[in-house]
């Protein structure tokens, strides 16, 4: 036995499974301004004390492993470990509690959402001592926020680029989402833009399939944009989906969009991945492209109430990674969305500073300092009769994204777009005149119908 090993054996430690609470449960800890704070909804296995599971979450998502190891002595665990500093019951749930965990900033790579999520949620969700685990919210400290570029441009710069103020923007997803040829697809884009929409959109799963290769789609959509701009005198755009199987192909598509001179591209940020998304966001800022973000796959992560991750966390991550728009639910329409909770993460996307407000699901005060805001997109299952509610709920800094609510008009695509635009302008005008959109919305739309298809 070497002298070094002999010395260690003489002053060694007891091997075996550790009790995490001896190290990672620290209710006396006072959080620092530089800590990343997390709120986890924990559903433990029966008979397991909350403290034991709370500290296990802190351990498994930071420096902990199931036993003491020799190399623990080569670093400072007190400096690097996560700490479960508070536990509270979930009202109305006997077997659940919220565990608050603080992580030292040195655990995370600067400017990397990928690394942040790998650390905080990458492993602990499979922990067998837990029946379920959900990340409800994160507090991102200013020191970490400042390491991110964030959205390529932000709300005000986008409005200046488009020269459109004082109202929500209007969009439409081209349908059917799959099966159209590039030429027919471009025709639908033109008809919608010519009818009065600001944007049209590739559906999230339109990439480069045999029936419509990406380059052909980009060319026909660019033609539709320029033709509609010439005829309306307004700046138009189409969300050209740059999502691809490799980052190299994604960037090739973004470069071609820039060469065509179009104003905006699109990315599926969850299926594409945060590293790809941040790369694309940096390119978009450097090259004057707006970036529309689709959240395809989000419900796999956020729909279950007890397990996964709340969308407000994904929304914060997107603001850090970069995107000028993101789909954010509707409150009305065909997708789920509670009004107060939805408006909570809408404010997290748009505002510079958001106070803690548990009634809206906001567990921590969040200061975004100089990080630009993201425009929330209301989409899926909406139509002109929803316009008063959408205008009231989302306000001006939003995109109201129709699909069947435009293309389903019995007279065709262009009349559907006209109906959308007339309804929006009627609601904005009524709101500015002091009318109550919630009470008078139906009447306002019926009045507008007299002057619209």
UniProtKB/Swiss-Prot annotation:
The keyword GTP-binding is annotated on this UniProt entry: no
GO molecular function: magnesium ion binding; monooxygenase activity; ribulose-bisphosphate carboxylase activity
Chain positions with N-acetylproline modification: 3
Cofactor, free-text remark: Binds 1 Mg(2+) ion per subunit.
Keywords: Acetylation, Calvin cycle, Carbon dioxide fixation, Chloroplast, Disulfide bond, Lyase, Magnesium, Metal-binding, Methylation, Monooxygenase, Oxidoreductase, Photorespiration, Photosynthesis, Plastid
Positions that bind substrate: 123, 173, 177, 295, 327, 379
TM segment ranges: none
Keyword tRNA-binding appears in the UniProt entry: no
GO cellular component: chloroplast
Enzyme's top EC category: lyase
UniProt: Mg(2+) binding residues: 201, 203-204
Substrates-to-products reaction catalysed: 2 (2R)-3-phosphoglycerate + 2 H(+) = D-ribulose 1,5-bisphosphate + CO2 + H2O; D-ribulose 1,5-bisphosphate + O2 = 2-phosphoglycolate + (2R)-3-phosphoglycerate + 2 H(+)
Function noted in UniProt: RuBisCO catalyzes two reactions: the carboxylation of D-ribulose 1,5-bisphosphate, the primary event in carbon dioxide fixation, as well as the oxidative fragmentation of the pentose substrate in the photorespiration process. Both reactions occur simultaneously and in competition at the same active site.
Quaternary assembly: Heterohexadecamer of 8 large chains and 8 small chains; disulfide-linked. The disulfide link is formed within the large subunit homodimers.
Protein name: Ribulose bisphosphate carboxylase large chain
Species for this entry: Phuopsis stylosa (Caucasian crosswort)
